[in-house]
Amino acid sequence: QRRFGGVENWINYSDDPQIKSAFKRIVSKVEGKPASIDKGRVLRVKNNDQFLFKDNVLKYIDENPEVDFYLFFPPYHRLKHVMWKKYDPSQYEIYKNRVESIVSLAENYNNVQVFGYDNFSFVDDISIYKDTGHYHPKINSLILQWMKNGDGELKPDMLQSYFNEVDKKINEYDLQNIIDLIKHKLEKDDI
């Protein structure tokens, strides 16, 4: 709980090895050379993802046609998407392929719904994240309510619009302010 509250709070707990490591990774990516898409890596991961999804998820869906399955992609903080798109574009393509593949495969089942929330505004609120991947537990209740209402459901014909919204939010995100705070903390602590 102590790390929720935004980057300033993360900085207050930068003695935490996980936070320290994340800060160093972020700064090294920003200061590194721009990366390009590794199409081989993207394809390998895509093929593996499809195999894993079929073997570990669809298997149970096939075995339980009377059960309704609600699947969702965890809503990472926008900073993670920004870092992927700008500094690890292969990972961003992997993310998009993963969403597309699962939504497409799920479309063949009447008892499966897939949801995504990366286009929702709460993903921009860093205060509800203890790092870029772990949101406050209260978000789980919101996600369940949204799923119940059908909010955020993804269908193949909606994906282009969904990714356009996500990309727009990524492009509008103020990364520099966070980078400056992190660099200042790292320089101050001589990390």
Where in this protein do the model-derived segments appear?
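Alpha-helix N-cap and loop-to-helix initiation/capping positions
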Residues: 45-48, 87-94, 135
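Conserved catalytic-core segments centered on acid/base and nucleophilic motifs
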Residues: 53-61, 67-70, 133-135, 139-140, ...
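C-terminal regions of proteins
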Residues: 99-191
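Alpha-helix boundary/N-cap detector
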Residues: 14-17, 93, 138
